């Protein structure tokens, strides 16, 4: 869990500094999360630099105006406080902007992947919510208009 939080911190720092690449220590879980990030289009990719020390280089992704796609990365379930969702709740759960990573008996999956898998099963399977990623998709001009509208 500490390695994942270190990776999240390195990604956040890299995004704030507008870096194109950050280097972190890897593990099996780190590779799972990074491949999921890559599949969802949140990073450009990652590459193993050194196999002996498990050094991984993460290539960050930005929009054309150099704003990041990620607005916040949060580790939800920690050792003492774990958050679980039942399978029936997962089928009715449709977040708009956030991306949820859920640990189930199928491994670490995003919410849409797990919902798709649950459609094929007779009894839906739930899991533990591990991470919540807030995606920065709102256009800044639209955001300003919404603020002005709320002020009136």
Curated annotation (Swiss-Prot):
Its predominant location is mitochondrion
Location within or outside the cell: Mitochondrion
The biological process GO terms on file are:
translation
* Statement: the UniProt record of this protein carries the keyword Mitochondrion: yes
Give the UniProt entry's GO cellular component terms.
Answer: mitochondrion; ribonucleoprotein complex; ribosome
Q: Which UniProt keywords apply?
A: Mitochondrion, Ribonucleoprotein, Ribosomal protein
The molecular function terms in GO held by this entry are: structural constituent of ribosome
Q: Which domain of life, per UniProt?
A: Eukaryota
Q: Which family does it belong to?
A: Belongs to the universal ribosomal protein uS8 family.
Protein name per Swiss-Prot or TrEMBL = Small ribosomal subunit protein uS8m
The source organism is Dictyostelium citrinum (Slime mold)
């Amino acid at each position: 869990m500490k390695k994942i939080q270190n990776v999240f911190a390195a990604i956040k720092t890299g995004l704030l500094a507008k870096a194109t690449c950050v280097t972190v220590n890897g593990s099996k879980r780190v590779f799972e999360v990074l491949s999921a990030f890559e599949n969802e289009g949140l990073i450009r990719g990652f590459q193993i630099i050194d196999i002996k020390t498990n050094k991984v280089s993460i290539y960050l992704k930005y929009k054309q105006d150099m704003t990041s796609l990620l607005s916040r990365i949060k580790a939800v379930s920690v050792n003492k406080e774990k958050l679980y969702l039942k399978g029936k709740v997962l089928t009715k759960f449709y977040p708009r902007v956030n991306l949820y990573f859920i640990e189930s008996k199928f491994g670490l999956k995003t919410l849409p992947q797990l919902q798709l898998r649950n459609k094929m099963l007779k009894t839906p399977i739930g899991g533990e919510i591990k991470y919540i990623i807030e995606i920065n998709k709102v256009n800044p001009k639209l955001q300003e208009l919404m603020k002005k509208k709320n002020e009136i």
